């Protein structure tokens, strides 16, 4: 075979599935597989560099975000309205969202943090909840699971007692109702107790970047992907 002659690879595939053709080719040709791996590696490095640029831009703009924060606080129930709209679109009517008093996002080289402040309420004792989401620092970490942590949530006594009564009453029902225990805590409170990457990144990427649109309910299209993702997550449980 001459140096310039193309290697022939025997492939069986469905004509109406072009993606299968490429997958089959990469599986059977080690040179193509090596090339694919190299491209994937470069793509990861590119994504990491873009993320670093985004962080640098945010750091430069943070003083402006803080200035904006003070102005937004002058609008009555601004963040409470935004979080209520968000979880309504996810299918939850949640009293706790109306108790959000302030909100801010900080971004560092290794993580971003959501600071959610609360006014006095009958559900949780926390005055502030901080949700921390780690961000990759190497291209290898891009494919790893994101670590998310949250402030321990202190449920008020009446909330705890109500949940306990609900659980006790459900113990006497059929086994098929056992899954309902997971639904006792839902919506915003569930997110605070067990935050998800999809909702956290959506809040930062869409809500935080354009809060006026969210306040005026002019961001319906932004929610489409989040609603689909949240629905898939519920089905997988």
Swiss-Prot record:
> What segments bear the compositional bias annotation Polar residues?
141-152
Q: Which domain of life is it from?
A: Eukaryota
Its name, as the record gives it, is Protein set homolog
| Family that this chain belongs to | Belongs to the nucleosome assembly protein (NAP) family.
- Give the GO terms filed under biological process for this record: nucleosome assembly
Give residue spans, biased composition: Basic and acidic residues: 156-173
Provide the residue span(s) of the region labelled Disordered. 141-182, 214-237
One GO cellular component this record assigns the protein to is: chromatin
Spans through the membrane: none
One GO molecular function term?
A: chromatin binding
**Family annotation (InterPro entries):** NAP-like_sf, NAP_family
